[in-house]
Amino acid sequence: MHAISFTALLLSMLAAVGLTATAGMKALKDDFDTVALFEKGQILLTVVVLAVSAVLVQALVVRDFSYVYVRDYTDTLLPLFYAVTAFWAGQNGSFLFWYLCVALMGWCMIYTPGYSRLDNRTKVFFWILFFLVEIFFLFALTGPSNPFMKLDPVPAEGRGLNPLLQNPGMIFHPPLLFLGYAGYTIPFCLALASRLSGNGREWLELCRNWNIVAWIFLTAGIILGAWWSYMELGWGGYWAWDPVENASLIPWLAGTAFVHTAIVGRTRKSLLRTNVFMVALTFLLCFFATFVVRSGMIDSLHAFSGSRMGIPLLVFMIAVLSLTLFVCLIQRKDDSTHIDDFASRPGMLFLASWLFLCLGGIVLLGVMWPVLSSMWSANPVGLDAGFYNRVCLPLFAVLALIMSICPWFSQKHGIGDKTALGVVLGGGAGSAGIIFALGYTQPLALFSAASGFMMVVSIVLYFVRTKGARSFLPSWGAYGVHMGVALMVIGVAFSGPYKVEAEAVLNKGQSMTVGAYEVQFIELRHHHDNPAMDMHAAHLAVTRDGKAVGSLAPEKRLYRSFEQSTFAEVSVIPSLGEEVYATLLGFNEEGSVSLKVSINPLVNWIWIGGTLSCLVAFLCWRKIERR
């Protein structure tokens, strides 16, 4: 099956090249009556990638170690569920999964009402662009990122899946990111196709639902990745500003900026070229995120080593950027970049969009800083988390402030409801005063928390005072997303600067004090009944003011396939207030343990807010009538 699968991908690439060439020649001749051919071609390409993906999954399930990929990411002790998810654990499999998502979305596009509203000219340009994207994926899968390489002789055992990836967060985090990346392919191709065909306005409405879905997947992937970092790595935090973490954040920032400029574009019939550039930039940055992971230029916990995809990705990104600039430079009669007044709701949305882009630019600069600094330094260094916290967090707080006051500006000029705006500002000032009185006086955290509470007040007040919003489902979606963001802002404001942590070496029966909590070491238990690993758990009792709070059992695990390393499994006592978080750093034969215990205030507000934002965003979906 190795050769058959590889040949199928190779033939798919040749078919995509043929379809692109045919579409290009038809476009040059102004012949746009062969759209059905391209649609059938896309269906065929999708069926092929579904088939080869099934082959790889089957090989992973039965542990067919004649595949290099299966040998590298599974072993006979790996549970079936994790064997299936190993499909996207490595760079070759994840690239196949990404292409599978792109192909499936292309297939779905054919049957959407929005697609039926496109004229044939726009459809032909759409398929030219879409097939070009697929050609890149197929080139990668038949060249530097081939998941069907054969291994001879066949080993009796595989190398196993990294234990850090054997976690629910990492099972779903990568596919959600790839679904988000793939989702932006449709708006990108639709925007450029509409621009090239001269049908420059309708695409914004037609790609609305695609944009929402892509944003939801990307947001969910990032939130889940942060939760995985918090629950699996054992360092007590959720965002380390690691280059690969940042790389996935950059397209999200650009995509969020596009969400807001698209609103202005649809309602004010302006910013058409700006929106084309925004969606193309988001699409491009999805590949930049992959470039950071696979190029080997950036050092990161998450990066793949030894990848040959760096140069192909760089060439592809240059081609996309060049095409985007060319398309954006084409003048259209309906082009308008005019904002009537920045002291208006469209003006606030536009300002928020540019702040998102500025944040993306800062994070991009930080990611590339080791590469840039190598131009003038023999010892290039990256920027630490302190840089991002000092520069980015204040801008996020300003964005929260803008989101809280934006609903009270009118569509054309000035403040539409001064009374409501006064209540919102008063709510922010009042919450800041209460927070300060409670002893939380750190300036940035105080400003951020007050901005978050202002958002909550603003959203509740908006629905109280605006009857139309209460009866319009997309309003519930949009403001529900903002409510989730408000909860996240408040969670970040408290969980970062007000975290309390301590480390201690304890013997049986001894205790350590962490903030207002007393943590007592009860016993160390050893478990050897799992054939895949040995587990060593420290059982702890937690009290506060003499009253029992709960128990903890952080673990150290030694996996048979990774005996050179031990892996921590944290334990938490969940709370909407202060969460107690424990990591077992080590132990000795005498039974003493080394522990790290943290008290993380309001950290669960981040996960609740992120989940809320992802779920209610589906309410923003709007029905599009077929033509």
Where are these regions (language model features)?
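Membrane-interface interhelical loops and short amphipathic "cap" helices
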Residues: 1-8, 32-35, 58-92, 146-174, ...
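Contiguous transmembrane helix-bundle modules in multi-pass membrane proteins
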Residues: 1-32, 47-52, 65-67, 243-253, ...
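Membrane-interfacial loop-to-helix junctions in multi-pass inner-membrane proteins
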Residues: 28-49, 108-133, 195-216, 241, ...
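A generic, lipid-embedded transmembrane alpha helix
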Residues: 44-61, 136, 217-226, 285, ...
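Transmembrane-helix bundle segments that line or gate the permeation/cavity pathway
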Residues: 49-78, 85-106, 110, 139-149, ...
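Accessory, solvent-exposed terminal regions and/or long lumenal/extracellular loops of proteins
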Residues: 425-430, 486-625
